[in-house]
């Protein structure tokens, strides 16, 4: 399955369809229709949060899905598919790719990422695993653990990389990531325009994930209203 999945997303746009509990569009049904609309617009894949949303989306579309499970724990800042329990739950949906926080930060219950990956590969040998990284150190860490894909998802969202943008200094961080690993790199995080999406692919990324700029109406509307307020 791995090679065929990778071919399907190569050079394309993956759309992240997520709405958290405190957001107006929080609904598995709505996310499934959002995913369908994205695929009709040319998306080659979908990134989705929670088994419930994933199963609803699977009933609507037939493109690869990157599955995650966002869950907060009191003893850790790691929240993207943070423990073996969440990783297993997402794998059980049958998604082609499962993404998880692959930073060097302490995980909930002091679980070890290497142990999680080793255990889950035995249970789901055909599933691909994507590392959501923040820093270059995270990239080296994820690479050493044997992740199938490296994502820049958490760049700008960890304490170490706070307030940074993937396009800063002419995409310098992304360029360093591409030099630091031979694994396919998925550009993700603050890619909020078509031109940015094109640029990251031109630089050599395997695929690009775009979320808020496509699927969060409140964010899109705010960009317009903020600009109008400048009048």
UniProtKB/Swiss-Prot annotation:
Gene Ontology MF terms: N-acylglucosamine-6-phosphate 2-epimerase activity
Pfam family, any one: NanE
Record's keyword annotation contains Isomerase: yes
Keyword vocabulary terms for this entry: Carbohydrate metabolism, Isomerase
Pathway the protein contributes to: Amino-sugar metabolism; N-acetylneuraminate degradation; D-fructose 6-phosphate from N-acetylneuraminate: step 3/5
RNA-binding is among the record's keywords: no
Catalytic activity: an N-acyl-D-glucosamine 6-phosphate = an N-acyl-D-mannosamine 6-phosphate
GO biological process, one term: carbohydrate metabolic process
Family (UniProt): Belongs to the NanE family.
Function field: Converts N-acetylmannosamine-6-phosphate (ManNAc-6-P) to N-acetylglucosamine-6-phosphate (GlcNAc-6-P).
The name this protein goes by in its record: Putative N-acetylmannosamine-6-phosphate 2-epimerase
């Amino acid at each position: 399955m791995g090679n065929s999945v990778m071919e399907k997303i190569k050079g394309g746009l993956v759309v992240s369809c997520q709405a958290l509990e405190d957001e107006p569009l929080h609904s598995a049904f709505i996310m499934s229709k959002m995913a369908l609309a994205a695929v009709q617009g040319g998306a080659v894949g979908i990134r989705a949060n929670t088994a419930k949303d994933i199963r609803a989306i699977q009933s609507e579309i037939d493109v690869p899905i990157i599955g995650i499970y966002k869950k907060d724990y009191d003893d850790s800042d790691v929240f993207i598919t943070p423990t073996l329990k969440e990783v297993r739950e997402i794998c059980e949906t049958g998604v082609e790719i499962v993404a998880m926080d692959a930073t060097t930060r302490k995980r909930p219950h002091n679980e070890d990422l290497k142990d999680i990956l080793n255990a889950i590969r035995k249970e789901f040998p055909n599933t691909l695993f994507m590392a959501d990284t923040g820093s270059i150190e995270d990239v080296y860490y994820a690479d050493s653990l044997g992740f199938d894909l490296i994502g820049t998802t958490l760049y700008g969202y960890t304490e170490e990389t706070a307030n940074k943008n993937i396009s800063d200094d002419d995409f310098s961080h992304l360029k360093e990531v591409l030099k630091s690993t031979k694994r396919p790199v998925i550009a993700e995080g603050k890619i909020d325009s078509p031109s940015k999406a094109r640029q990251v692919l031109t630089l050599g990324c395997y695929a690009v994930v775009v979320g808020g700029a496509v699927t969060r109406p409140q964010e899109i509307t705010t960009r317009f209203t903020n600009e109008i307020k400048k009048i």
